[in-house]
UniProtKB/Swiss-Prot annotation:
Protein family according to the UniProt entry: Belongs to the class-I aminoacyl-tRNA synthetase family.
Record lineage: Bacteria, Bacillati, Cyanobacteriota, Cyanophyceae, Synechococcales
The protein's Enzyme Commission number: 6.1.1.19
Subcellular location, record wording: Cytoplasm
Protein name stated in the entry: Arginine--tRNA ligase
Gene name linked to the record: argS
Molecular functions (GO terms): arginine-tRNA ligase activity; ATP binding
GO biological processes: arginyl-tRNA aminoacylation
Catalytic activity: tRNA(Arg) + L-arginine + ATP = L-arginyl-tRNA(Arg) + AMP + diphosphate
Length: 607
């Protein structure tokens, strides 16, 4: 109801001008009247919107709040556009004004959605004021997933990957130009260590494709790390290898590239299963910019030499000992670290093309444990004046994935769970559930159907279980809960869609014009009002970057539809009620499909 809300805001502002003339307003009164005074109703029985400013105004202008509310309501009743949209305002409690959209307007909105693939969700309008040439107000960079080369993706990568993907989809749908970046860990001391170890143990890995699996690389990495920690000679060799790599030694670069490619292939298998689209741009991409970052910070007198290291001390940043804690930008041996690379990335991403990406909004999706790191890096970028006033840069943190015991999710042996194993188990459990249900229902389906449904349900359940949680919180992972057909789960939503698809197949083609759509039952109006909330919810997710708000809406919509389905005849109703109710079924299905696609969740016609 974004458009209706905007028109009501305009009508309300016109009423304010009449009831509270500009010349009679105090600064406090003006502040109240120019605030956000129209809000969605807190409960369905209060209507669609509420105006709550009378109580605040009462203290300022010394009048009873109900009297103020009545004056505003009376003036709204004189506004032609308001009267066309709304039933007469109702005063409630100490001075709340409750507004209900009239049936004619609701039916008109439903009819518009019949022919609108966007289902009433407008494209965002972007200002072009004060934008440098080459920049765009709608260009967003989403940094998410970001696994490390030579390591397998684990359950910890799941949240960043699917939260980042869903936010990218929602922002793209709203009209943003989104660059999805995979900032993989493809550089650093660990490569010198790994290459040195592989040269001695399995040298063929470093010049031949596909000799080892990613799981083998992980084991080799563990062996190399153990040697690095215990053997000074090996440690020195590893550091020399890093120097060779940084200097562009041909043999070292070939070995490094083979390791990256092998990992990249394994990552892509996961991304394909999850339907994730990403542009890889690893840490190594920014190597050529690191010296410029140091020089720029030096020229701006932000760096302090601390025992040979180049550091920045930020206000309020102290260590456990209570002393100021430095952020090291360049180590005493001349090397760089994560902070340096992240600063180079910020600078490049905000610089106009062809020397950068020209983005106006940067979003980093990582675990909450990195909040302090990003806070420091963002502060340094601001001090260096790399972030224009019209640009946003934000960290989107998320909590841990826990087991049902409330502890960090691990295997029985205490190992971190591989993401591929998690997906495989979800699909296998979904397949077992499906086969049991088919046996109970005495249904016969071929293996292709069983494989497709179990894969879709398994992947959808994993994604939805995560996205339906407030990302800021830790959440407890449970296969039983996420695969259940009851509650706020992917199978519940998928089943609602399958149910609607069955009704639509029996209902036949729809051919209904606006003048003969007719609704009479309370369940119909409840469903209509819920359907018309989609645009508001998506705008809210765009602003707050909380995908669980969309999940909550889709669950409530499914519940509302199921009540409508259970309590109101559809296929057996007489015309025009039959066609009108089939229209509601169709728009509900379209809304669920759109919402789930924005979450990156696949759907089914049959289960």
């Amino acid at each position: 109801m974004l458009e209706i809300s905007a028109r009501l805001e305009e009508a309300l502002n016109r009423a304010f001008i009449k009831v509270f003339p500009q010349e009679d307003r105090s600064s406090k009164t003006s502040s109240i009247l120019t605030g956000s005074n129209l809000v969605p109703a807190s409960k369905p029985e209060f209507g669609d919107f509420q105006i709550n400013c009378a109580l605040s105004l009462a203290k300022e202008i010394k009048q009873p709040p109900r009297e103020i509310a009545q004056k505003i309501a009376n003036q709204l009743q004189k506004d032609n556009d308001f009267v066309r949209m709304c039933n007469p305002p109702r005063i409630a409690g100490p001075g709340f004004i409750n507004l209900s959209i009239n049936s004619k307007t609701l039916i008109s909105e439903i009819h518009v959605r019949l022919n609108d693939k966007r289902l009433g969700v407008p494209l965002k309008k972007f200002s072009t004021d004060k934008i440098e040439e080459g920049k765009s107000n709608n260009r967003v960079i989403l940094d998410f997933s970001s696994p490390n080369i030579a390591k397998e993706m684990h359950v910890g990568h799941l949240r960043s990957t699917i939260i980042g993907d869903s936010l990218a989809r929602i922002l793209e749908f709203r009209g943003y130009e989104v660059l999805r970046l995979n900032h993989v860990g493809d550089w650093g001391t660990q490569f010198g260590m790994l290459i040195t170890h592989l040269k001695e143990v399995v040298p063929e890995v470093l010049h031949t494709k596909d000799v080892v699996e990613i799981s083998d690389l992980v084991n080799f990495y563990r062996q190399a790390k153990k040697r690095f920690d215990e053997d000074q000679i090996f440690q020195n060799k590893s550091r020399s290898e890093v120097v060779n790599l940084q200097a562009g030694d041909k043999e070292s670069l070939i070995a490094w590239q083979l390791l990256c490619n092998q990992s990249r292939k394994e990552f892509q298998k996961i991304y394909d299963r999850l339907d994730i689209k990403l542009t890889e741009r690893g840490e190594s991409f920014y190597n050529k910019f690191l010296v410029d970052v140091i020089n720029d910070l030096k020229n701006k007198k932000l760096l302090i030499n601390d025992q040979g290291a180049q550091c920045i001390f930020l206000d309020g940043l102290v260590g456990k000992n209570g002393k100021p804690q430095p952020i090291i930008i360049q180590k005493s041996d001349g090397g760089f670290n994560y902070a340096t690379t992240d600063l180079a990335a910020i600078k490049y991403r905000l610089t106009i093309p062809p020397h950068g990406d020209g983005a106006c909004r940067l979003i980093y999706v990582t675990d909450a444990g990195q909040a302090s790191h990003f806070s420091g890096v963002f502060q340094i970028a601001k001090l260096a004046n790399w972030i224009p006033t019209d640009c946003q840069i934000e960290h989107v943190p998320f909590g841990l994935v826990q087991g049902e015991d409330g502890k960090k999710l691990k295997t029985r042996s205490g190992e971190t769970i591989r993401l591929v194993d998690l997906l495989d188990e979800a699909i296998q459990r979904a397949k077992n559930d499906l086969k049991n249900r088919l046996n109970t229902e005495r249904r016969s389906e071929n293996e292709n159907f069983i494989d497709k449904v179990s894969t879709t349900v398994g992947i959808a359940s994993i994604k939805y279980a995560d996205l339906s949680q407030n990302r800021i919180s830790n959440y407890q992972f449970s296969f039983d809960k996420m695969l259940s057909l009851q509650g706020n789960t992917a199978p519940y939503l998928l089943y609602a869609l399958v149910r609607i698809a069955g009704i639509s197949r029996k209902g036949g083609d729809l051919n209904v014009s606006s003048h003969n759509i007719q609704f009479n039952e309370s369940q119909e109006w409840e469903l209509i009002r819920k359907l018309l909330q989609l645009d508001y919810i998506i705008a809210e997710v765009e602003k707050e970057l909380l995908p669980n708000r969309l999940c909550g809406y889709l669950f409530e919509l499914s519940q509302t539809f199921n009540r409508f389905y259970d309590q109101v005849p559809i296929l057996k109703a007489s015309e025009p009620s039959r066609a009108s109710r089939l229209i509601l079924c169709s728009i509900t299905a379209d809304t669920l499909k759109l919402g789930m696609s924005l979450l990156g969740i696949p759907t089914l016609e049959r289960m």
